[in-house]
């Protein structure tokens, strides 16, 4: 207790007071550990009171490092201390809560804590290490210069606990190290880590693994710094790269034993991968040593993995790290695969993978085999089987990682991969034949893995066989392997995979062979089959429908459709969640095969889908799959009448039910389904949809306080207005209000300043559709809507809401420019100036952030029209407005930290509106050019690399690479995204109103280029060009201005 007494004295508090607080703290900690709930709750309240006292942290530190203290109290004190440091040590911290620890207390805590790193109890030691590292993040080197000397002394002390404690601090500290600390850290830490890593006789495997992990963390960090400060790597890491690399090469060759195991090799491989990724130029010379050794690790690990995991013919103990985490052997396999991915990502090393493809793919297939553990889990839990084997699974196993690697090489080297895979599969199948004949039971797993591999990349295989680029006996594979395996009963997983594989290769089959496989697939659905076979049969059916629709040979499927439908409905009745989703997805595609068949079965399909939708009403995935089925049924005219008779009353009763009587979210989903039906039905719509569903959705939207219901209600009314405005306008209620009146009520509600701003996220689309369809009939109402939009804009904070509102004005620029300008000039904005100024300021400050291809086109072309009008009509209303131009940075400011930003708020230039519009148009052109260029850079271009200059140290190539993505700001990447096709896959492309708009078809790059070229010819252009910056001039140069 001497340390505690000294601390009490140091803190300047009189002994008894300090002692009293400390005793209170011990009592409180004891209370928190109590099994009695009331006592615990009271103690947790009490700790909040003590937390704000000056001595709280000091007492926690004393209790933590007191070897005489009770173990439970010490552990709890160490955990609370760790939290205390996070929240009170430094006011700059994101988690900070006042008060800040006083200087006096900090000195005492820094004095006490390092003793805890020698602690024999690992949990206490780890918590102390965490606290020391968190303090060091703020205090080292200025306030705690001696810390690193202390840690280094511990590392060489020979005391195992002290070594572990110090390594824990360094591990945590380097993860959070700042770029101002790194130049001080790297020269001290890295040489020490090298010593620890290479002194196998002094330090244990886990400590040496930690040393490598710390090296890897530093390597990544220094690479990130290099982007901002050129030359950082040269000073901080290059001096040690060579010696580390040589040591890594040595370490990978040591067989497992007292100084090496799979966990250790995994860390070493991660380090080598980090070097290859971050400093490829520096690694070129070492590659000849590294590659054969990693290759050996890959091949030896494969044999070991097959024995211990796939076939489980050999028991092994997995290593455990110093925190008790099990380091499964699969982690080593993951890091080998990561290394290969890193080679693929770099043009310097890519061709090494290309040369090794036949062997590499042979081993990938070994790693793709099903393990005994998976057989056990999947047999017991079919849901898990569906989830793990799904293309978009979140599971991560060696099998999945091997598939990922196969797909990566197949994408990068299509022709070579096809040949390599054909050769590897042929070799495996021949070897499996020998294994099978010798009576070994696991031969089928290789068959399954070969089918999985070939089926995963089926397109490159079938194309290459068709073009004669590879010699692969496709017919032999289909009949002697897949069909033959279907007649064996070795494993349900082989049967299932064979059904799936067959469905991938219909293009290579004769109609007779397809029929044989379809017969087998339908039998596979049968209730007597194991779940895994039935599930695989469902996947196969999806494949057949998909493939045979593409090749226009669905007639082969027709005779099997009745039994397929029955099989699917039976299966859905027996399973929920994952299996059910798969069945629904497949049922949906089955509905599209033959409209006549689907119509004849509507009485089965529709009631089933409604029942499933109601039973799983709280599952959004099931709801959306049910919606897809209703969509398909709506598009078949013969199904429309009967389906609406069944479905619409159900949806109406949900919309009319009191909110507390139905599950949350059900009403919003019901409205969504109604929208789908309306959108996919050809007008005129039935009485049921107009006289029952329309009023129900309008009333429901007006009387709900649920955001999702309001949003979906607005979208549903937009569908009605878009599909059949006349019918909406003709219908009226008993009071004589017609459908348009109701739509107006809903618009007002969505824009009401009192409702949440998120209800307005789609209101812009509703208003724009309303204006485009009913423009002239709106009269006074239009002014009313626009006023509401202006007031909503003054409260909106979210970009999506603001964009939705501004888009209404953008659409009006296209259709009613002059009336719009008049209207906006007749109203005052929030500052008293005309509302036009407010709208243009909001629009121009956000245009570069807008997302969505369609929105991008509408707003960009509208800006062109505004600029053109402002010049041609010499319109003072636009010419006199000034808006924010560009941010002004002072030259001596350096890096803009939070504290600097607080002292010096942002400053902007102030420029004429029309100049700002020109700048935005140029920016849009730049973005769309970049997106188009990226889209045209097909993978074929990337894989043309000259293998002969492989090892040459190319300065230029390096420069180009570094200026690639690394130099882009996140904002740039986000800005270009609105024109990237695949960025918003589900965005407006499926919005029918956008698709119908001629603006959507515009080639924006051509339009903007043309506009700017014409604009540059105008006499006024001289005045504009003086305002352009270098970037903008460069963009204009690319189009010849």
UniProtKB/Swiss-Prot annotation:
One of its GO terms (biological process) is proteasome localization. Residues 943-964 have a biased composition (Acidic residues). The modification N-acetylalanine is found at residue 2. Residues 936-967 are annotated as: Disordered. GO terms for molecular function: histone binding; histone chaperone activity; nuclear import signal receptor activity; small GTPase binding. It holds the Pfam family HEAT_IPO9_c. Keywords: Acetylation, Chaperone, Cytoplasm, Nucleus, Protein transport, Transport. PROSITE patterns: IMPORTIN_B_NT. GO terms for cellular component: cytoplasm; cytosol; membrane; nuclear envelope; nucleoplasm. Residues 43-119 form the Importin N-terminal domain. Belongs to the importin beta family. Nuclear transport receptor that mediates nuclear import of proteins, such as histones, proteasome and actin. Serves as receptor for nuclear localization signals (NLS) in cargo substrates. Is thought to mediate docking of the importin/substrate complex to the nuclear pore complex (NPC) through binding to nucleoporin and the complex is subsequently translocated through the pore by an energy requiring, Ran-dependent mechanism. This is Importin-9. It comes from Homo sapiens. The gene is IPO9.
């Amino acid at each position: 207790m001497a340390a505690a007494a000294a601390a009490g004295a140091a803190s300047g508090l009189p002994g008894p007071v300090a002692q009293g607080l400390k005793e209170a703290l011990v009592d409180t900690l004891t209370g928190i550990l109590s099994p009695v709930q009331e006592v615990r709750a009271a103690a947790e309240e009490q700790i909040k009171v003590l937390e704000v006292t000056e001595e709280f942290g000091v007492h926690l530190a004393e209790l933590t490092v007191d070897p005489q203290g009770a173990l439970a109290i010490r552990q709890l004190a160490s955990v609370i201390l760790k939290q205390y440091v996070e929240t009170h040590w430094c006011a700059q911290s994101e988690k900070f809560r006042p008060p800040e620890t006083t200087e006096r207390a900090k000195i005492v805590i820094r004095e006490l804590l390092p003793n805890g790193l020698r602690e024999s109890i690992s949990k206490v030691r780890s918590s102390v290490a965490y606290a020391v590292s968190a303090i060091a993040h703020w205090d080292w080197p200025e306030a705690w210069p001696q810390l690193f000397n202390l840690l280094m002394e511990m590392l060489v002390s020979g005391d195992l606990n002290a070594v572990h404690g110090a390594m824990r601090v360094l591990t945590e500290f380097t993860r959070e190290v700042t770029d101002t600390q790194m130049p001080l850290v790297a020269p001290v830490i890295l040489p020490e880590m090298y010593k620890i890593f290479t002194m196998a006789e002094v330090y244990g495997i886990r400590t040496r693994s930690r040393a490598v992990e710390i090296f890897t963390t530093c390597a990544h960090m220094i690479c990130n710094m290099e982007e901002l400060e050129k030359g950082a790597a040269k000073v901080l890491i290059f001096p040690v790269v060579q010696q580390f690399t040589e040591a890594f090469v040595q370490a990978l060759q040591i067989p497992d034993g007292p100084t090496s195991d799979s966990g250790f090799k995994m860390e070493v491989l991660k380090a080598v991968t980090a070097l290859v990724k971050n400093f490829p130029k520096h690694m070129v010379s070492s590659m000849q040593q590294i590659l054969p050794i990693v290759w050996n690790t890959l091949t030896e690990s494969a044999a070991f993995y097959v024995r211990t995991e796939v076939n489980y013919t050999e028991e092994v103990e997995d290593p455990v790290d110093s925190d008790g985490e099990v380091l499964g052997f699969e982690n080593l396999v993951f890091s080998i695969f990561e290394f290969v991915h890193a080679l693929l990502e770099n043009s310097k090393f890519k061709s090494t993978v290309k040369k090794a493809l036949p062997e590499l793919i042979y081993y990938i297939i070994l790693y793709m085999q099903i393990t005994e553990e998976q057989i056990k889990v999947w047999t017991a839990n079919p849901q898990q089987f569906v989830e793990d084997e799904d293309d978009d699974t979140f599971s991560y196993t060696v099998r999945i990682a091997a598939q990922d690697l196969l797909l990566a090489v197949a994408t990068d080297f299509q022709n070579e991969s096809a040949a390599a895979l054909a050769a590897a599969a042929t070799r495996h199948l021949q070897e499996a034949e020998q294994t099978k004949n010798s009576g070994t039971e696991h031969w089928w797993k290789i068959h399954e893995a070969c089918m999985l591999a070939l089926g995963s990349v089926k397109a490159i295989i079938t194309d290459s066989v068709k073009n004669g680029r590879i010699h692969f006996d496709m017919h032999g594979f289909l009949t002697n392997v897949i069909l033959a395996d279907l007649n064996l009963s070795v494993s349900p997983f082989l049967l299932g995979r064979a059904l799936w594989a067959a469905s991938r290769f219909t293009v290579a089959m004769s109609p007779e062979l397809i029929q044989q496989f379809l017969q087998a697939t339908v039998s596979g659905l049968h209730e007597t089959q194991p779940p895994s076979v039935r599930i695989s049969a469902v996947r196969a059916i999806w494949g057949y429908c998909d493939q045979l629709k593409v090749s226009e040979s669905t007639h082969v499927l027709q005779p099997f459709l009745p039994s397929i439908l029955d099989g699917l409905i039976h299966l859905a009745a027996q399973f929920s969640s994952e299996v059910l989703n798969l069945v629904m997805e497949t049922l949906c595609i089955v509905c599209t095969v033959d409209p006549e068949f689907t119509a004849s079965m509507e009485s089965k399909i529709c009631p089933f889908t409604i029942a499933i939708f109601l039973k799983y009403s709280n599952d959004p995935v099931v709801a959306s799959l049910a919606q897809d089925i209703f969509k398909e049924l709506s598009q078949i005219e013969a199904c429309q009448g009967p389906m609406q008779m069944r479905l619409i009353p159900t949806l109406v009763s949900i919309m009319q039910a009191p909110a507390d009587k139905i599950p949350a979210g059900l009403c919003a989903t019901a409205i969504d389904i109604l929208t789908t039906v309306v959108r996919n039905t050809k007008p005129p719509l039935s009485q049921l949809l107009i006289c029952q569903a329309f009023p129900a959705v309008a009333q429901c939207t007006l009387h709900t306080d649920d955001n999702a219901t309001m949003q979906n209600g607005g979208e549903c009314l937009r569908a009605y207005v878009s599909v059949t405005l006349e019918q909406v306008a003709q219908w009226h209620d008993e009071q004589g209000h017609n459908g348009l009146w109701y739509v107006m009520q809903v618009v007002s509600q969505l824009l009401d300043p009192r409702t949440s701003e998120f209800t307005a996220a789609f209101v812009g689309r509703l208003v724009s559709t309303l204006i485009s369809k009913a423009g002239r009939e709106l009269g006074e109402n239009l002014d009313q809507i626009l006023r509401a939009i202006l007031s909503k804009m003054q409260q909106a904070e979210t970009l999506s809401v603001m964009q939705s509102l501004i888009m209404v004005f953008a659409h009006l620029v296209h259709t009613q420019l002059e009336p719009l300008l008049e209207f906006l000039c007749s109203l005052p904005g929030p500052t008293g100036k005309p509302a036009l100024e407010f709208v243009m300021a909001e629009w121009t400050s956000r245009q570069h952030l807008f997302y969505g291809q369609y929105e991008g086109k509408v707003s960009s072309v509208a800006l062109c029209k505004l600029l053109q009008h402002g010049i041609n009509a010499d319109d003072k209303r636009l010419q006199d407005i000034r808006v924010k131009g560009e941010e002004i940075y002072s030259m001596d400011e350096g890096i803009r930290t939070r504290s600097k930003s607080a002292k010096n708020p942002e400053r902007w230039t102030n420029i004429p509106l029309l100049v700002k519009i020109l700048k935005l148009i140029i920016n849009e052109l730049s973005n769309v050019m970049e997106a188009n260029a990226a889209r045209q850079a097909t993978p074929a271009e990337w894989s043309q690399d000259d293998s002969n200059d492989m090892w040459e140290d190319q300065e230029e190539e390096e420069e180009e690479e570094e200026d690639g993505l690394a130099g882009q700001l996140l904002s740039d990447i986000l800005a270009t995204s609105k024109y990237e096709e695949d960025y918003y896959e589900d965005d407006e492309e499926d919005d029918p109103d956008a698709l119908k708009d001629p603006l959507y078809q515009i080639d924006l790059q051509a339009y903007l280029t043309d506009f700017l070229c014409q604009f540059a010819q105008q006499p006024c252009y001289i005045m504009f060009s003086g305002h352009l910056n270098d970037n903008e001039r460069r963009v204009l140069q690319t189009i010849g201005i």
